[in-house]
C-alpha cells in the first residue's frame, strides 16, 4: 500500500520508491547477515545439543536392564524391599478400612512412630537372608535407599508421616521393558517413590522406559468418609456393587492389584485401586496388552497376589476363602486352577496389614523353582507334588509388615518373550 501511494505522487513518488528501495535493500542485507549469523549459531548449538543428547543416551546396550512379561519366566534381577525405619501409618480412614479391627488400638497408639524395634530388627535380618539366598540362586538383587519414614510432610490437601519401602510390588510394576510407578492411595505412601528413584534412574540411563502414573492429590474427595467399617455384611454388599473406601475422584492404584500373564494383565477394583486407575493402565498399555478386571468374594480386597497368584503358563493359585467370580474365563482357556492348603501361621502372630494367606504369596524363580515360607509345610508339599522345587526361607516377622515373597519383591528382569496365554 505504501508503494502504490508513492507512485501516485509523481516525481516525489519515484524518489520515495528509490529511497524506500535503498532502505529496504540495506534492511534486507542486514537481516540476511543477522539471519545467517543466527543460523550459524543455531547450527553450532544444535550440534552441541545433539552431542550432549548422544552422550546422555548413546550408546544404548543391546539388552535392556528391564524386561519382564509374566510371573514365572527365569528370574535374573529383582528389587527387594527394606524394613529399616518402617513406620506405623497414621490411623486415617483408608488405613482403617484396610486393617483388621483387632489391630486398631495398635494403630491409634503407634501411628506416626516406628514399628516395634525388636520386631523390625528380626524382619531386617530375615530379608537380608532372603537376599543372600536369591543371590546364591543366581539372581541380581537391588535394594531401595534407606529413608527415615517418621518425618512429617504436608501438601495443600493433607499432612502425614511415611510408611516404608518394604513392598516394591505395591509401587512398581514392570511390563516388558517399561517400569511404571503406581499412584498409590494411602497418604502415608505419597513419597514412597523417593526410595526407588536412584534404582529407576539407573535403569533409565541404561535404556529402560520409565513412566510415572498421574499422582493423586489425595484430597478428602478421594475417600468415602462414611464408608461402613464395622459391618462385614455391608462391606460384602458394597464390594459387590464396586464401592470401596476410595472413590472415583481421581485415578489411583497399587501395582500389587495387577498380575501379569504375557499379553493379558488381570486387575481388581480394591480399597486402594479404583476403576479410573485401572482404565489409565488399560489405555496406557493398549494395544499390546489387554487389562481384564476380575473380582472376588472378598469384603476387603487389597492386592491381588494373596488371592489370585499366577505361578506358571496357565497355572494359578486361587484362594478358597476368596473365590474368583470370573474363574470360568480361565477354565475355558484350559488353565489349571490350584487350591492352596490352609496356612498354618499361629493366631497369635501379629499380621498388622495382611491375612494368613501370605502363604500363597510366593515368588517364582522360574517354572520349576519357588521361594516359599520355611514354616508353611503344607504348601511346600503342594509344590513338590507339582514337580516344583521349593526354596525355603523364613520371613515370618517380615510378614507382619504386610507381605510375603511376592510383595517384598519387584521382578525387574526375567528371561522370556511376550506371549499370549489366554487365547
Curated annotation (Swiss-Prot):
Residues 39-65 are annotated as: Disordered. Pathway: Amine and polyamine biosynthesis; creatine biosynthesis; creatine from L-arginine and glycine: step 1/2. CDD domains: amidinotransferase_AGAT-like. It catalyses: L-arginine + glycine = guanidinoacetate + L-ornithine; 4-aminobutanoate + L-arginine = 4-guanidinobutanoate + L-ornithine; beta-alanine + L-arginine = 3-guanidinopropanoate + L-ornithine; taurine + L-arginine = taurocyamine + L-ornithine. Residues 1-48 form a transit peptide. Residues 52-61 have a biased composition (Basic and acidic residues). Coiled coil: none annotated. The modification N6-acetyllysine is found at residue 385. GO terms for molecular function: amidinotransferase activity; glycine amidinotransferase activity. Keywords: Acetylation, Membrane, Mitochondrion, Mitochondrion inner membrane, Phosphoprotein, Transferase, Transit peptide. Residues 39-51 have a biased composition (Low complexity). The active site is at residues 254, 303, 407. Belongs to the amidinotransferase family. Arginine binds at residues 170, 305, 322, 354-355. It is found in: Mitochondrion inner membrane. This is Glycine amidinotransferase, mitochondrial. It comes from the Eukaryota. GO terms for cellular component: mitochondrial inner membrane; mitochondrial intermembrane space. Transamidinase that catalyzes the transfer of the amidino group of L-arginine onto the amino moiety of acceptor metabolites such as glycine, beta-alanine, gamma-aminobutyric acid (GABA) and taurine yielding the corresponding guanidine derivatives. Catalyzes the rate-limiting step of creatine biosynthesis, namely the transfer of the amidino group from L-arginine to glycine to generate guanidinoacetate, which is then methylated by GAMT to form creatine. Provides creatine as a source for ATP generation in tissues with high energy demands, in particular skeletal muscle, heart and brain. One of its GO terms (biological process) is creatine biosynthetic process. The lineage of its organism: Eukaryota, Metazoa, Chordata, Craniata, Vertebrata. Its EC number is 2.1.4.1. The gene is GATM. Homodimer. The modification Phosphoserine is found at residues 46, 49. InterPro entries: AmidinoTrfase. It is an enzyme of class 2 (transferase).
Amino acid at each position: 500500500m505504501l508503494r502504490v501511494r508513492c507512485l501516485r505522487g509523481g516525481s516525489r513518488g519515484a524518489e520515495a520508491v528509490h529511497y524506500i528501495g535503498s532502505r529496504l535493500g540495506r534492511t534486507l542485507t542486514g537481516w540476511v547477515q543477522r539471519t545467517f549469523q543466527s543460523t550459524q549459531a543455531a547450527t553450532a548449538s544444535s550440534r552441541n545439543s545433539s552431542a550432549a543428547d548422544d552422550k546422555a543416551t548413546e550408546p544404548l546396550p543391546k539388552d535392556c536392564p528391564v524386561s519382564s512379561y509374566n510371573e514365572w519366566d527365569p528370574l535374573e534381577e529383582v528389587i527387594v524391599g527394606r524394613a529399616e525405619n518402617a513406620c506405623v501409618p497414621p490411623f486415617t480412614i483408608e488405613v482403617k478400612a484396610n486393617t483388621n479391627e483387632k489391630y486398631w488400638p495398635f494403630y491409634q497408639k503407634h501411628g506416626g512412630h516406628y514399628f516395634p524395634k525388636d520386631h523390625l530388627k528380626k524382619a531386617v535380618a530375615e530379608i537380608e537372608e532372603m537376599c543372600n539366598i536369591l543371590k546364591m540362586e543366581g539372581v541380581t538383587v537391588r535394594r531401595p535407599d534407606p529413608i527415615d519414614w517418621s518425618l512429617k510432610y504436608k501438601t495443600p490437601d493433607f499432612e502425614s508421616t511415611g510408611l516404608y519401602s518394604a513392598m516394591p510390588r505395591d509401587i512398581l510394576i514392570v511390563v516388558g521393558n517399561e517400569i511404571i510407578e503406581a499412584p498409590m492411595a494411602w497418604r502415608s505412601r505419597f513419597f514412597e517413590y523417593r526410595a526407588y528413584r536412584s534404582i529407576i534412574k539407573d535403569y533409565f540411563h541404561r535404556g529402560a522406559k520409565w513412566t510415572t502414573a498421574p499422582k493423586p492429590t489425595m484430597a478428602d474427595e478421594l475417600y468415602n468418609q462414611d464408608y461402613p467399617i464395622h459391618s462385614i455384611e455391608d462391606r460384602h454388599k458394597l464390594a459387590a456393587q464396586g464401592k470401596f473406601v476410595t472413590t472415583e475422584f481421581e485415578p489411583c492404584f497399587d501395582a500389587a492389584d495387577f498380575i501379569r500373564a504375557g499379553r493379558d494383565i488381570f486387575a481388581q477394583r480394591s480399597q486402594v485401586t479404583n476403576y479410573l486407575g485401572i482404565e489409565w493402565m488399560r489405555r496406557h498399555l493398549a494395544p499390546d496388552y489387554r487389562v481384564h478386571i476380575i473380582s472376588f468374594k472378598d469384603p476387603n480386597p487389597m492386592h491381588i497376589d494373596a488371592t489370585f497368584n499366577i505361578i506358571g503358563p496357565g497355572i494359578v493359585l486361587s484362594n478358597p476363602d476368596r473365590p474368583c467370580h470370573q474363574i470360568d474365563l480361565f477354565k475355558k482357556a484350559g488353565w489349571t486352577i490350584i487350591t492352596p492348603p490352609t496356612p498354618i501361621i499361629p493366631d497369635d502372630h501379629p499380621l498388622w496389614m495382611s491375612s494368613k494367606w501370605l502363604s500363597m504369596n510366593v515368588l517364582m524363580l522360574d517354572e520349576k523353582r519357588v521361594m516359599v515360607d520355611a514354616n508353611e509345610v503344607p504348601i511346600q508339599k503342594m509344590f513338590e507334588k507339582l514337580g516344583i522345587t521349593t526354596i525355603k526361607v523364613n520371613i515370618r516377622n517380615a510378614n507382619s509388615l504386610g507381605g510375603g515373597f511376592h510383595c517384598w519383591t519387584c521382578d525387574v528382569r526375567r528371561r522370556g518373550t511376550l506371549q499370549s496365554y489366554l487365547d
